[in-house]
UniProtKB/Swiss-Prot annotation:
Gene3D superfamilies: Ribosomal protein L9, C-terminal domain, Ribosomal protein L9, N-terminal domain
Gene Ontology CC, one term: ribosome
Keywords: Ribonucleoprotein, Ribosomal protein, RNA-binding, rRNA-binding
NCBIfam families from the UniProt entry: L9
Gene Ontology biological process: translation
Ribonucleoprotein is among the record's keywords: yes
PANTHER family per UniProt: 50S RIBOSOMAL PROTEIN L9 (PTHR21368)
A GO term for molecular function: rRNA binding
Function recorded in the entry: Binds to the 23S rRNA.
Family named by the database record: Belongs to the bacterial ribosomal protein bL9 family.
Organism: Acaryochloris marina (strain MBIC 11017)
Protein name (Swiss-Prot/TrEMBL): Large ribosomal subunit protein bL9
InterPro entries referenced in this protein's UniProt entry, alphabetically: Ribosomal_bL9 (IPR000244), Ribosomal_bL9/RNase_H1_N (IPR009027), Ribosomal_bL9_bac/chp (IPR020594), Ribosomal_bL9_C (IPR020069), Ribosomal_bL9_C_sf (IPR036791), Ribosomal_bL9_N (IPR020070), Ribosomal_bL9_N_sf (IPR036935)
Pfam families according to UniProt: Ribosomal_L9_C, Ribosomal_L9_N
Length: 152
């Protein structure tokens, strides 16, 4: 295989990489297509330092987000049980069911944390009782809380 050229992508290129990625390509592909179209630029030592600096800042930012999620997890688990009132009929069956938007709204009202309803893993709640609900606050941080469904 011949010599390869290091480039930094300005935009996403299918089967090659995403914007900001450092990639190695054939010199002809770089010279004839990627660079003239403005899709990529040469990776000089100064550019490589900038990329490393940006990655370090991004890593720091992501760690901050993860730490914030861990604090939210502790706060949610300190609250303990979240109580939600629903209309119920015979044999403690609910009229309807408790859904993830209901739980997200309940948590927001009680704790003040805005939780994405798509991050809530909720069992099928159609009866009164206490249920365990997993809340994905971050890809690496999952909080488990109790939701108690009581009659109105």
């Amino acid at each position: 295989m011949g010599k390869r050229v290091q480039l930094v992508l300005n935009e996403d290129v299918r089967k090659l990489g995403y914007s900001g990625d450092l990639v190695e390509v054939a010199p002809g592909y770089a010279r004839n297509y990627l660079i003239p179209k403005g899709i990529a630029y040469r990776a000089t030592p100064g550019v490589l330092k900038q990329i490393e600096h940006r990655k370090a800042e991004e890593l720091k930012r992501l760690e901050g987000i993860k730490d914030e999620a861990a604090k939210q997890k502790v706060a949610l688990q300190t609250i303990g049980t979240f109580r939600i009132e629903q209309k119920a009929g015979e044999e403690d069956m609910l009229f309807g069911r408790v859904t993830s938007p209901d739980v997200a709204e309940l948590i927001a009202n009680i704790s003040g944390f805005e939780i994405d309803k798509r991050g809530i893993d909720i069992p099928d709640i159609r009866k009164l009782g206490t249920y365990s609900v997993d809340i994905k606050l971050h890809p690496e941080v999952i909080a488990t809380v109790k939701v108690e469904v009581v009659p109105e």
